[in-house]
Amino acid sequence: MKHYESYFYSTRDRDTRHAASAILDAVFPLLPRVSSVADVGCGVGVWLSVLREKGVETLQGFDGFWVEDGQLEIPVEMLKRVDLEQPLQWPVRYDLLLSLEVAEHLPPERAAGFVEDLTKASDYVLFSAAIPRQGGYHHVNERWQSFWAGLFAGRGYSPVDCVRPRFWNDDSIPCWYSQNMLLYVKDGAPLKHPPVYPMPLDVVHPAAYLGKVNHPDFRYGLSLAKRAILHKYFGKPF
C-alpha cells in the first residue's frame, strides 16, 4: 500500500473533521455504549481525535510506517504501525471499528482477508471504500458497495444504511462518505432505532458524477470522440 504525501493530509483533514463529528453523532445513538474504537487506515488520526473529543475512552489507530509523527492529530502512542496488506492481529476487540476509504488502496487479492480481519475485531464496522471510477491516489481495487456487502455477508454481517440517507443532500459532508459509507453489524448484535428507508447499495453521488464529467480530461476526451465521428461519417476534418 503506497503512502500519501504530506500535502494530501493537510488538505483533506480540514474537510474531514466536521464530517467525522456529524457522522459519529448519527451513528452512536444506534449502538450500545461505545467506549473503545479502532480506526484501521487512520492516516493522521482525524477521526480518532474527534472521538477523543467526544469522550471515547479507549482509542487505537492502525496505519503504515509512512505516516509522520509530526503530522499526527493524536498522541504517537495511539498509532500502531502495521502493513495493511498483511493479516492483522487484534489483542482486544472494540465496541466499534472504522475503516474509511482504505480498502481501495489494497490489492484485490487482499479484499476478502481484509474484511475478515475487520470483523474479527468488532461486531460493528463503519466502512467505506471507493467505487469504480471514483478515482484517487493509488486506488487499485475500486469496487461497488455491493461487492463489499457480499464479503461482509460471508462473515455474518449485514449493512445498516444509517449514514448515506441522512447526509446525501448535505454539501458539508464529502460526497465519498455520503456515497460509500455503511455500518456493518454482526447478525444478532443489538441495534437501536435501525433506519427505515435504506437506499440501494450501489449508488453514485451527484457531486461525484459532476466532478467527473466536468473534469477537463473528460471533456477533452468527449471533444476528440465527437471530432472522430464527424470525420468518419461526414468527412469533416479531424
Q: What is each PLM-predicted segment?
A:
Residues M1-L98, E109-A121, G135, H139-L151, ...:
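Conserved N-terminal segment of class I S-adenosyl-L-methionine
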Residues V102:
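Hydrophobic adenine-recognition pocket in adenosine-nucleotide-binding enzymes
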Residues H105-L106:
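A short His-aromatic
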Residues S122-P132:
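Conserved beta-strand signature within the Rossmann-like core of class I S-adenosyl-L-methionine
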